[in-house]
Amino acid sequence: GSGKTLPAEFAIKYFVSQGKKVIYTTPIKALSNEKFNDLQQKYPDISFGILTGDIKYNPEADVLIMTTEILYNTLFQKIMIEKNNETKQNITLDFDIDIQRELSAVVFDEIHYINDADRGRIWEETIMTLPKHVQIIGLSATIDQPEHFCQWIENVSSRETWLCSNKSRVVPLTHFAFLTYPESSYDKFSLEIKNKIE
């Protein structure tokens, strides 16, 4: 891997050692499953849960891994409960962390999905809705103009934000080009290569 998950792992270890909870969000179920398995193997002394819509396992865990949409839906259900003075018995929540007292950090893996035309609004509203005391950790290897993105987070959430970037690559990048040629030019191209080899 590229090592971009390391800040999230530090946060998980730190906050769990303080008796707090962490939510780790991903854009797709497959990545949630992968992160759940990877983190559970790497940190067997920490309790992990997963919520993807298809799977609901250990929702009381110290670290919950889920899609961003599940976090969004639960946050807004909790807001509706508070606003309408409803009891939790009337609404089924995917998880029931006390956001104010227990939750310390939310990791947004592949945070560049905030630029997705269809799903970006969910990511934006989730970030804007999180209480100020909850640390936001955004991970991306491909986000465009990260400085502007950090400034946006500061503006909408009143949080001091730091950008940690690393231009070096842990995994070397090799460029390949795959070309197709119409059959009529293939014979000519093949003959030219054959002549150069001989």
Give residue ranges: language-model regions.
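Walker A (P-loop) phosphate-binding loop of P-loop NTPases
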Residues: 1
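Conserved nucleotide-binding/hydrolysis micro-motifs of P-loop NTPases
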Residues: 29-31, 55-57, 69-72, 112-113, ...
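SF2 helicase catalytic motif II
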Residues: 68-70, 79-137
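Motif I (Walker A/P-loop) of helicase-class P-loop NTPases
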Residues: 4-13, 119-124
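Post-Walker A helix-loop "phosphate-sensing" segment adjacent to the P-loop in P-loop NTPases
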Residues: 14-21, 157-159
